Amino acid sequence: MSPQTETKSSVGFKAGVKDYKLTYYTPEYETLDTDILAAFRVTPQPGVPPEEAGAAVAAESSTGTWTTVWTDGLTSLDRYKGRCYHIEPVAGEENQYICYVAYPLDLFEEGSVTNMFTSIVGNVFGFKALRALRLEDLRVPVAYIKTFQGPPHGIQVERDKLNKYGRPLLGCTIKPKLGLSAKNYGRAVYECLRGGLDFTKDDENVNSQPFMRWRDRFLFCAEAIYKAQAETGEIKGHYLNATAGTCEEMIKRAVFARELGVPIVMHDYITGGFTANTSLAHYCRDNGLLLHIHRAMHAVIDRQKNHGMHFRVLAKALRLSGGDHIHAGTVVGKLEGEREITLGFVDLLRDDFTEKDRSRGIYFTQSWVSTPGVLPVASGGIHVWHMPALTEIFGDDSVLQFGGGTLGHPWGNAPGAVANRVALEACVQARNEGRDLAREGNTIIREACKWSPELAAACEVWKEIKFEFQAMDTI
């Protein structure tokens, strides 16, 4: 063992401050299969060498502090410390580096996303030696993954519950998001489900406000679901938002949803917190409820390119914590999402195994072993003209969610749902016949308009609506 990294009591205690790189920068280290690996985008302060910056990240997110302490001699830091084992410059950026850090598995509590994040993205992000710091990706070892339950049910179980195969699922967020009474809200849910949608959704803002208390909303939405099911012969659902001010209240709402016999509830997992989310996911698995996850507040954390945490890390954390759906951007709608980056974390949500692919922002090969997959939800500023692109980009295992693109139909909610269902069925049929959705998408939609006046009206309303802004988050 190098004297530079010797930290046992035999060395003796020497008070003072020493460079982090003497202990925590170990380029000779060979990572273990049980290590949690992190890729940080590090922007050091002027005059701080990248080796010192990377070592500081490893130290402050594991066993280190700003000065030598005598209690270092009471343990083996070489067993427990994080190690910065590789540094590479970021192409096209001045004084910015990707620093790779390995963490021993014993640093983390089993089955706790909360504890994992408290260590890896805790105080280190306020460290003065760094101008900016962003966690780009994590490699979660199989040994740690197996301590988590993961999604309550997963993609295949959900399809079996709904008896729906071979196409994306269709949803709609009820608008206006705030202000409707429970009865009028339930009416909108019924009209959308009757028109052909598989799901409707509470907006993330909807909890239990004075204009619509949660219990009233749950009752009217359950009535809407059962009425639509009886009339269409299809299984329907509404994402009843169980997010609340306390975990106890959240579980109480989930219990009431189960008593009503509805298939799915919802949680805002970032604002609600990972501890609450994991608790709700466990309840949902034990009681046969699907769990829809909204990512409200994610852009506060992930939108800045140089500081924060990339959404692919939040997506991996959600797959560990538990959720059957999660919002994942659209590529083509009103919300941020560059195509290759979005498809990278969509695959991380759905697939059992993903290879390292830096062109899609994937820094590590990741195995999920037996952890169920999560359905990505495309939502935000999408309408019928986007249907071919969405079908081609996201494939069958996805939820395509049209809020304004359903409720904004000139003829009303049910015709809006009809238009979306017809557009989806036309795109799926065309794809199955071997047609190129990317090249022939508009033609396919126009052909379907000939036998669907609802779709024709929707196409006329949204024919010139585009959201063309450059993505902030690029490779």
UniProtKB/Swiss-Prot annotation:
Mg(2+) binds at residues 201, 203-204. InterPro entries: RuBisCO, RuBisCo_large_chain_AS, RuBisCO_lsu_C, RuBisCO_lsu_C_sf, RuBisCO_lsu_fd_N, RuBisCO_lsu_N_sf, RuBisCO_lsuI. SUPFAM superfamilies: RuBisCo, C-terminal domain, RuBisCO, large subunit, small (N-terminal) domain. It is an enzyme of class 4 (lyase). The modification N-acetylproline is found at residue 3. The disulfide bond which can form in the large chain dimeric partners within the hexadecamer appears to be associated with oxidative stress and protein turnover. Transmembrane segments: none annotated. It comes from the Eukaryota. Pfam families: RuBisCO_large, RuBisCO_large_N. Its cofactor is Mg(2+). The keyword RNA-binding does not apply. The modification N6,N6,N6-trimethyllysine is found at residue 14. Binds 1 Mg(2+) ion per subunit. The basic functional RuBisCO is composed of a large chain homodimer in a 'head-to-tail' conformation. In form I RuBisCO this homodimer is arranged in a barrel-like tetramer with the small subunits forming a tetrameric 'cap' on each end of the 'barrel'. Belongs to the RuBisCO large chain family. Type I subfamily. This is Ribulose bisphosphate carboxylase large chain. It comes from Cerastium glomeratum (Sticky chickweed). The lineage of its organism: Eukaryota, Viridiplantae, Streptophyta, Embryophyta, Tracheophyta. The gene is rbcL.
